[in-house]
């Protein structure tokens, strides 16, 4: 066993210690370099004053060393790694669902930096995008690679004085000296400031922000409004540069601005805007075209890819549907479907071949198809603002809602009253409920039943006095006393207006015609009125009316008291201490009566003697008026003598009590209880039947309602047609196929000859897999016999194909079969639309990758685009086929579409006249092929036009029911109708689609009109699309 050389170790001890020290020094150097590379260098405790110089420790008068004010910040800076962790939590808020992990497309390597980059930073502008939150900016389809404008700014304070835009400002910050720095951001509306630990965009962290919802904002320079605006102190080094990114979103309100300030982490220092001396460009973009995006940095703040946020959508159309992926199921062989149904001629009566159609009147000859099952294309989430689906007036729905569809359940004891209300017209008064001129005097008599109106001596005859009771006296009427030089003093009592020679009608309008006198017993009317020297007992129950004076308005009518609409001015009262005695009472008119609203309903009380008759010569403004509501007040019957007892008991009040009562009311301010609270019946129930508003719709092309979906086909009809077809199919093949589900049924109705159906069924083959059946069938009405449209292939006699029971029977329409392998060409004219061309090509490549369908081609007609190389972008896109056509001059949509169709050589292929700003569903190719039949059908799908700030993941908008610009048709049919009108629509567009529709219908083709699921037209800005000059300083938005 070898021994340890102890003697040698002792001799070389000094050398071994030296080697150990060198090893430790090398290890510490390695660790230090590694920390520096990660931005967490070993730091010394240094303090920085207001001028940036290092502070020295000082000794106060007591000989104690005073620590610098920044030492607490230095202590906290040692745990910088732990403090930065909470800032990084916003990644999960911005990108939920595991988006916190770094996607593969983050930018880790920065482009070469040059000294001339100093003094400015990169600015990317995303115009015409609604919303005030930064999250709304991230929903933009082109964010962050394809902005509307690329430019630079010289300081981190920007105010374009515009609306509905988003900004992305990025570059490098160069600190002036080493030390701890705080950042703050201020903006209107929301903004976020991201700062990297070094120059790499991948290491950016959110350090300060203004709001998350879009409703938060600050004034310019207001750096301390929100706690989230100010960052934690961060140690920066003057020898390095730090990548930053500033995101800002502005809506259509407020004073737009965004600025970033910084300060040394010292008490009392204010934030200062970061100027050009401390910023530099990320890279120079001045020589790059808009389709060059490899240099654009992608950071955690803004990047492409990753896991998108999973938001709960409110649109039913986004929910999965078997139609979306049914095209991937293998289709049945055409040989298996031969001789299943008997052939029959197909010539619907709604085809207007060779019929003269006026300009733009082809819209009236387009009919809609019925769909089963429900495809949820109805925009239910948009009906809060647009209720046109219900075929009701918007004003009516806003005022009355949907209560007419509900029948309120009757309460016990209210059956007769409710029946009477239902028998009356809604909001119309019954003339029999009003009193004639002779009967109006009865309102002034008494509470006893009146059998006939007593004779009156004149229009101002006083009402008969009530029977005298023991202890009750009535004062005679007293005229108003003159005041201030003979000016008559008006009484504040509630009284009847003087009657003129000719009474005025209750409603100012046409008087009702006189009714012939009918020998009927006069109705007994009980009227509650203000009687002199009487008070209604507060314990007396309120009477109920046999029917409401306004039928249909109140479910439970209440008698209303008579009120004085305009009272005369109150005489001035001396200010002083109020007492309850009569000495403190000022002289007042002897007549004083007051109607109350705050007490029991239908009760009135009087204070003092009766009011005198008012002179008819007084001004109209000072004349006491009785409300019309009081004329309609009807009370129930009252027992004889009941009112007199109440009068006796309540006429004993002293004058002092009256004054005290009035003083207390005046001291309390306005009368309490003047407005009644509505009673709420929480136990009210109602009855309602099933309502299907789809029954109110027809197949007429509705151009007024743009939120309604496809017409719904009744389930019984769809099941009956499917059952007939499956019966014939199994009879032909001996029960080899079993029906799994009905995926889609479309019906075009012809009330004269029959209906056309498109059946799409999922079948299970015996001993095989699942198959897709998608065929047109015709349900011919009994006795309907027509020849073929071109006089060929006469159909057999109707008796040979009509069922014995006389019911319609299915047949196979001749020359109405669609081809599954036909080529589809997308024709798109473009000009200076780099970001939209790139998005369109990306969508087409994704469509090819998802469906595996290579039977389509993209034809781009370029009108000298200057912002990108369209041909190079086409070659770089992963498309199965493409064509590039270059034209000179201004943009002409009609000429561009015609040139694209002329470039297609195969006349038996489909051309789809398309737009650049379209989001296609995955089944778009299958939908175009199914609804285009050569010589028979053309397809004009309805696209959903997205609103500003809306995206396909959260679609808000409306169906473009008037637009026919997206049009699919066989090239042979397109050439036969004459193509596009390039002569009339040369320098303008808008109307060329309607003009083409007129000629297509005149050629005898049907135009299939359906709303496609997930088929959107992106909202986009029209600024700079066709080289239109803009006015400097204009603040009007793009249309």
From Swiss-Prot:
Residue ranges annotated as Cytoplasmic topological domain: 1-15
Protein source organism: Homo sapiens (Human)
Record has Glycoprotein as a keyword: yes
Residues with attached carbohydrate: 105
GO molecular function terms listed in the Swiss-Prot or TrEMBL record: acetylgalactosaminyltransferase activity; N-acetyl-beta-glucosaminyl-derivative 4-beta-N-acetylgalactosaminyltransferase activity
Record field: catalytic activity: an N-acetyl-beta-D-glucosaminyl derivative + UDP-N-acetyl-alpha-D-galactosamine = an N-acetyl-beta-D-galactosaminyl-(1->4)-N-acetyl-beta-D-glucosaminyl derivative + UDP + H(+)
Subcellular location: Golgi apparatus, Golgi stack membrane
Ranges annotated as spanning the membrane: 16-36
PANTHER family xref list: CHONDROITIN SYNTHASE, N-ACETYL-BETA-GLUCOSAMINYL-GLYCOPROTEIN 4-BETA-N-ACETYLGALACTOSAMINYLTRANSFERASE 1
The protein's name: N-acetyl-beta-glucosaminyl-glycoprotein 4-beta-N-acetylgalactosaminyltransferase 1
